[in-house]
């Protein structure tokens, strides 16, 4: 006989009913697993309560500084990476970089100057650093900044 999905059953003891406490002496009644006396036996204590010691949220320092809400995040591509992805040179824009898997689509792109490039490329990006511009133009390429 072949085993089918509707024949499968949980292993014995794998599924146990939830124990209902405080429902009579014979089944975890009376103290219901809370022990005797004290705050924890009588009522809830806050989840962050540490028994009177200084709580972790008061021991740790407050965050310093601030976060600029208007910061622009760029997907970065180095000149060396462009040389790897486009060994024949040609036009390098956002669409080509997305197709090559270097950046994600619908994101701002910044070209950085790490690495070497020996082929002429026509780079179009939102931002290009000074060193990247120098290397690309020295190799015979052109740079167009969109931003």
Swiss-Prot record:
This is Large ribosomal subunit protein uL15. Gene3D superfamilies: 3.100.10.10. One of its GO terms (cellular component) is cytosolic large ribosomal subunit. Part of the 50S ribosomal subunit. Pfam families: Ribosomal_L27A. Keywords: Ribonucleoprotein, Ribosomal protein, RNA-binding, rRNA-binding. Binds to the 23S rRNA. Residues 15-28 have a biased composition (Basic and acidic residues). It comes from the Bacteria. One of its GO terms (biological process) is translation. Belongs to the universal ribosomal protein uL15 family. The keyword Transmembrane does not apply. Residues 1-42 are annotated as: Disordered. GO terms for molecular function: rRNA binding; structural constituent of ribosome. Signal peptide: none annotated.
């Amino acid at each position: 006989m072949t085993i089918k999905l509707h024949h499968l059953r949980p292993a014995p003891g794998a599924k146990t009913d939830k124990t209902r406490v405080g429902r009579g002496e014979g089944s975890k009644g009376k103290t219901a697993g809370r022990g005797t006396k004290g705050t924890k036996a009588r009522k809830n204590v806050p989840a962050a309560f540490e028994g009177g010691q200084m709580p972790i949220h008061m021991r740790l320092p407050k965050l310093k500084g601030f976060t600029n809400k208007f910061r622009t995040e760029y997907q970065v591509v180095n000149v060396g990476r462009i040389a790897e992805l486009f060994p024949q040179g040609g036009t390098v824009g956002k669409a080509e970089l997305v197709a090559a898997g270097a950046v994600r689509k619908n994101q701002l792109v910044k070209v950085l100057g790490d690495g070497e490039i020996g082929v002429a490329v026509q780079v179009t990006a939102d931002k290009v650093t000074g060193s990247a511009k120098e290397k690309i133009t020295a190799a015979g390429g052109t740079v167009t900044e969109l931003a």
